[in-house]
Amino acid sequence: MRLEELKRLQNPLEQVDDGKYLLENHQLAMDVENNIENYPLSLQPLESKVKIIQRAWREYLQRQDPLEKRSPSPPSVSSDKLSSSVSMNTFSDSSTPVSVSRPLAWTVLH
């Protein structure tokens, strides 16, 4: 091989090496951004996913705060209504009503 050919072939190899380091550098930058430290290989994928999800959830909650201040949520069911409906289903001796289940054929025929 001639010297020019060797230089021409060597250049793509250097680019491949540079690309590998660039990819590793990008991964390290993403790990730092996601607050991921070095863990044993068996734990790293799970830990990194958990931290990414936690960060996304915090960002989601922060975005929801301004939205809640702009548009109030609909009124919730009051506890008074809930307690009155429960007390209506309770007998005076504090026992609760028991529903009798009938076979479907019996209810259709009668």
From Swiss-Prot:
Skewed-composition ranges (Low complexity): 76-87
Domain (IQ) ranges: 47-67
Region named Disordered: 63-99
Top-rank taxon: Eukaryota
Residue intervals passing through the bilayer: none
Biased composition (Polar residues): 88-99
Matches recorded under PANTHER family: IQ DOMAIN-CONTAINING PROTEIN J
Protein name as it appears in the record: IQ domain-containing protein J
Annotated organism of origin: Mus musculus (Mouse)
Lineage per the UniProt record: Eukaryota, Metazoa, Chordata, Craniata, Vertebrata
Gene: Iqcj
